[in-house]
Amino acid sequence: MSRWRVFARCRREFVFHYLSARGGWDPEMPEVLQDIYRYKHFYPIDLHVLDIIKSSFFRASGKYWHGRQDEYRRSFLRFAKSDAAVLVRELAGLACIRDPYGIRSVLEIENEGMDFDTAAAEIYARTEKAALLFIENYGNLFCEHTPLDWIGTQNIISFSCEDVTIYLPRGAAWIKNGRAGWLDIGLYGADTASAPGSEEWRRYWLFRKYGVEPGRADIAFYDIFSGESFTRNIMDFDFTGAKEIMFRQAVIMREWVREAVQTGFDIMETKPEEGTDCRKCRFRNFCRKMEA
C-alpha cells in the first residue's frame, strides 16, 4: 500500500501529499497550501520517462502485430520519441517551472538546479535508451498476442473482493490458453528480484475474476533502465490475512491523523525515518523553506 509506505517513511511527506491541498488548486487558498500544491507536481525525470514508456506500450496494444515484429519495433520507438517531444513542449510552454495547474514539472530543476535545456536533453536520451531496451527485451510481446488476448489495464482498475475495494495500477495483462500474464513496467533498479511481492495479490484476484486457476498466472517486474526483469508465479494467497494487515495500517494512519488534528501539533516537528533520502523528495525545498 503506497500510502502506508509514505506514512512509514516520513510523516511530513504523508501530510503534504495526501492531506494538504487535496481539494485541488484554489487561488484563494493560503499561500502555504498553494506552495504544497505546486510541489506535489514535481516529478523526477525517470518517472516522466516511465510514463512515456507505458504510454507508448498502450498506444501499441490496440493494433494487430502478428508477423510484423520489425514494424512494431519501429512504431514503439516512434511513439516514445513523439511522447517525449510532447512532454518537452508542454514543459517549455509553462510560464514558470512551478505552474500551479499541474503539468508535471521536473524535480531535478527544483532540487538540483538543473537548467531546462539539460533536463530536456535528459528526457530525450533516457526515453530513447528505455525504449530500445524495452524493444530488445519485449519486442515480440505484441507479436505473440492478438488484441483479444489483452485485459484492459490502460487505466487504474478497481473492483470489489469480499468487502474490500482493490485498486490495480496500470500494467499489461493478458490471458491466453488458460494462462494469465502481467508485465509490471516500473523503476525497480537492477535488482528486480527485490520488487514488491506484496503487489502480487492484487493481480492474483484480478486473474481469478477471469477464471484463471492458481499457479497459472505469472507476473514479471521489469525495470525500464536496466532491462532486467524478475518473474514470479502467482499462487493462491491468504486474502484474509492481507486484508487484516491493510485494515490495521489504515487504523494506525487514521488514529495518527485524528490525534494530530486534536492536538494541533506542528508537522515540521516530525523527522523522516532514519535512512530516508530527502534529496529525492519533491517537498525537500518546501521543508527547507519552512524550517528557515
Segments (PLM) and residue ranges:
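A non-catalytic, helix-rich entry segment at domain boundaries
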Residues: 52-147
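Mg2+/Mn2+-dependent nuclease catalytic core
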Residues: 147-246
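Well-ordered, non-membrane alpha-helical segments in soluble/globular domains
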Residues: 122-136, 196-204, 243-250
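Glycine- and acidic
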Residues: 35-42, 182-189, 267
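Metal-dependent nuclease catalytic regions and adjoining charged, substrate-binding loops involved
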Residues: 206-292
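Nuclease catalytic cores
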Residues: 4-93
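Short, compositionally biased low-complexity segments
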Residues: 19-33, 77-111, 175-179, 215-227
